[in-house]
Amino acid sequence: MGRIGVLLLNLGGPDQLEDVRPFLYNLFSDPEIIRLPFTWLQKPLAWLISTTRARKSQQNYRLIGGGSPLRRITEEQGKALQAHLASQGQDIQVYIGMRYWHPFTEEAIAAIKQDGITRLVILPLYPQFSISTSGSSFRLLEDLWQRDPQLQAIDYTVIPSWYDRPGYTQAMAELLREELDHFAEPDRVTIFFSAHGVPLSYVTEAGDPYQAEIEGCTALIMQALNRPNPHVLAYQSRVGPVEWLKPYTEEVIPELASQGVNELVVVPISFISEHIETLQEIDMEYRELAEEAGIEHFRRVPALNTHPLFIADLSQLVLEALQGPSRKFDQVVRPQKQVKLYPQERWEWGMTSAAERWNGRLAMLGFLALLLELITGRGPLHLVGLL
């Protein structure tokens, strides 16, 4: 029958402060995170952004203990999943593959090959699909498969998303219910679903299903909760000058306060593990914002981590994937068109060779301007918060 494996995919995070800059470099080197008109600009821009943002990011990681807990928690999830599968009589090895830090996806693939895995379930730890998260990891894996005959011999299947799994939504509702019950009148507390944002162009131009899956997930959690609480959905972690999915978390919180909301429970809907976006951005930045706006009671639902219902549902998901038809990389959602993650022009790029030459010259001037801004610490990118 052969050996069976599960590859858990995640973002990755710096284990210590010294890892922050190279982690950011890896992140911004990914064209699914920042798309540029010229690919040769990707690495220089990644170096600029990682160098200029490293100190601020290190300060944020210092506030949560000096590094991201994501690797530790993901490894705990992997061990819990493997143990639950074993309790069902399944001898399945679980591997961890991070996109931007150790253990890298390539390291996991090397272990999978060495262990002689013949059947593989590829399971991203992102409940909702986006071309910038699961899609980026799938693109990397597809490239590895195309270049490696040994990988091509593995019977694999991918799971694009699982936001509508009953065990997942029930586990989220259970944690939410526990937080609501800390209030004197639980049914009157406003529930604030905060999801990681993506550029609007991903959804409107590239066909990313992320927004629809986030909205569907919110509805399913409220259905599982079965309480009459008012609730809102917003998007956090926006960077750069382009428009992202709205409404923005940092704008909605003061709006709620101005409407008289005094009690708020935040649900990190797109995060299944504690990391910088929950521990620092929500717990510190948004809590302070809420208190300054007049919201006196602010609580946050913890991430699922190794919640028993969640792990049991992941285990069942793996077994269903093994029993069903295989799903290949070319069956996963892909961008419908090339999307540039910078302010869009009203005219098309590269209509003539002369235009291409001018585009190249403008790009070089832009790169020199970036270098000048890095040296002086002043410029438009600082004003919009990209640097």
UniProtKB/Swiss-Prot annotation:
The lineage of its organism: Bacteria, Bacillati, Cyanobacteriota, Cyanophyceae, Gomontiellales. GO terms for cellular component: cytoplasm. Its main location: cytoplasm. One of its GO terms (molecular function) is metal ion binding. GO terms for biological process: heme biosynthetic process. This is Ferrochelatase. It catalyses: heme b + 2 H(+) = protoporphyrin IX + Fe(2+). It comes from Cyanothece sp. (strain PCC 7425 / ATCC 29141). Coiled coil: none annotated.
